[in-house]
C-alpha cells in the first residue's frame, strides 16, 4: 500500500487531451458549488445559471493551457468569480445578494426570524467591497481553503488569509448586534 496522492481525474483527462470528458467531469463534480458561488455573488438564479454556463465555456476554452496549479475547484471558482464580476459591471443590476436563501412558503415565527437574519446579512454583505464579498463567498459558500482562495484571486496564501480576516471583521461591524 502506498501513500502517494491519487491524481485528480480531471487533471489526468486534461493531460491526455480529453477536454470534453474533463469538462463533463467538472460539471458533475463541481457544478453545484459553482452554482452556489454564482448565486451568492449575483443574487439571481437566472444570472447564476448564465454565469455557470459562461464559467464552464471559459474553462473549456482554457483547458489546453491549464497549468495544474492548485485544485480544479479553485481554478473553476476563480473563473466564476471573474465571470460574475464582469456580469455585475456590465449589467449594473442592484440585485440583492442571496447568500442565505430562505423559502417563502413557511410563515412561522422561525421563518420570519430567518428572513430577517438573511436580509440583515445581505445588507451587510452589500456594504462590503466586491473583493471582500468574493473571498467570503469563496470561503463559506464554495468551501475553498485559504490556499485555494489564494489561487482563485491570484494572491499568495498569507494575503488571502488576511483578506478573509479583514472581510469578516468588516462584516461583523456591518451586522447589527451579534448576528454573526
What are these model-predicted stretches?
Residues 1-33, 40:
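N-terminal module of bacterial RNA polymerase sigma factors
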Residues 2, 100, 114-115, 120-123, ...:
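C-terminal edge and immediately downstream basic/flexible tail or linker adjoining helix-turn-helix-like DNA-binding
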Residues 15-16, 43, 54-71, 90-94, ...:
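Sigma70-family region 2
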Residues 27-45, 62, 125, 174-177:
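Amphipathic, Lys/Arg- and hydrophobic-enriched alpha-helical face
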Residues 30, 51, 163-168:
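Residues within the DNA-recognition helix of helix-turn-helix
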Residues 36, 50-57, 70-82:
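Structural recognition of an alpha-helix C-terminal capping motif at a helix-to-coil junction
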Residues 61-68, 78-99, 113-114:
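Arg/Lys-rich amphipathic alpha helix in sigma70-family domain 2
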Residues 126, 130-134, 142-162, 170-173:
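Helix-turn-helix DNA-binding module
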Amino acid at each position: 500500500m502506498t501513500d502517494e496522492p491519487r491524481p485528480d481525474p480531471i487533471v489526468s483527462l486534461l493531460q491526455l487531451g480529453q477536454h470534453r470528458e474533463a469538462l463533463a467531469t467538472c460539471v458533475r463534480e463541481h457544478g453545484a458549488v459553482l452554482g452556489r458561488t454564482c448565486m451568492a455573488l449575483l443574487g439571481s438564479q437566472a444570472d447564476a445559471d448564465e454565469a455557470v454556463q459562461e464559467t464552464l465555456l471559459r474553462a473549456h476554452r482554457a483547458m489546453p493551457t491549464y497549468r495544474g496549479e492548485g485544485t480544479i475547484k479553485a481554478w473553476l471558482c476563480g473563473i466564476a468569480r471573474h465571470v460574475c464580476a464582469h456580469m455585475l459591471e456590465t449589467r449594473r443590476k442592484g440585485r440583492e445578494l442571496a447568500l442565505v436563501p430562505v423559502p417563502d412558503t413557511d410563515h412561522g415565527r422561525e421563518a420570519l426570524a430567518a428572513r430577517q437574519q438573511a436580509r440583515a446579512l445581505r445588507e451587510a454583505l452589500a456594504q462590503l467591497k466586491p473583493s471582500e464579498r468574493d473571498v467570503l463567498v469563496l470561503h463559506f459558500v464554495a468551501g475553498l481553503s485559504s490556499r485555494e482562495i489564494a489561487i482563485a484571486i491570484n494572491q499568495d496564501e498569507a494575503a488571502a488569509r488576511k483578506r478573509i480576516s479583514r472581510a469578516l471583521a468588516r462584516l461583523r461591524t456591518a451586522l447589527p448586534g451579534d448576528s454573526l
